[in-house]
Amino acid sequence: MTMPKIMILPDKYPCSITSILITSRCRVTMYNRKNTLYFNQNNPNNHMYSPNQTFNEIHWTSQDLIDTIQNFLQHLGVIEDIYTIYILVS
């Protein structure tokens, strides 16, 4: 099984996440500032993000963003290649 395809738009760093759109043939889910993006897992470089820390308040580098999004997707159970993930950043 391969991981979902992840697209970052626009491709610029450092960045803040504006929205995450998860799509498949029968499902579309969007996470944005209105339904705030919470993530309470450890990221690979051992920085802990508080459950109240929103994605859009963190300035991401390229690899940190990819690693954290993959952990977030695993947390949601989105681990199959039937999904395409669009990360909108500013």
Curated annotation (Swiss-Prot):
> Which Pfam family, just one, is annotated for this protein?
Pneumo_M2
Q: Keyword DNA damage: yes or no?
A: no
Cytoplasm found in the keyword field: no
**Main subcellular localization, coarse class?**
host cell
Q: Which GO terms describe its cellular component?
A: host cell cytoplasm
- Name the InterPro entries on file: Pneumo_M2-2 (IPR009969)
Subcellular location, record wording: Host cytoplasm
**Alphabetic keyword roster:** Host cytoplasm, Viral RNA replication
The source's domain of life comes to: Viruses
By sequence similarity, the record places it as follows:
Belongs to the orthopneumovirus M2-2 protein family.
Instruction: Write out the function statement from the record.
Output: Mediates the regulatory switch from transcription to RNA replication. Acts late in infection by inhibiting viral transcription and up-regulating RNA replication. Inhibition of transcription by protein M2-2 requires phosphorylation of the phosphoprotein.
State the name under which the record lists this protein: Protein M2-2
Q: Which gene encodes it?
A: M2-2
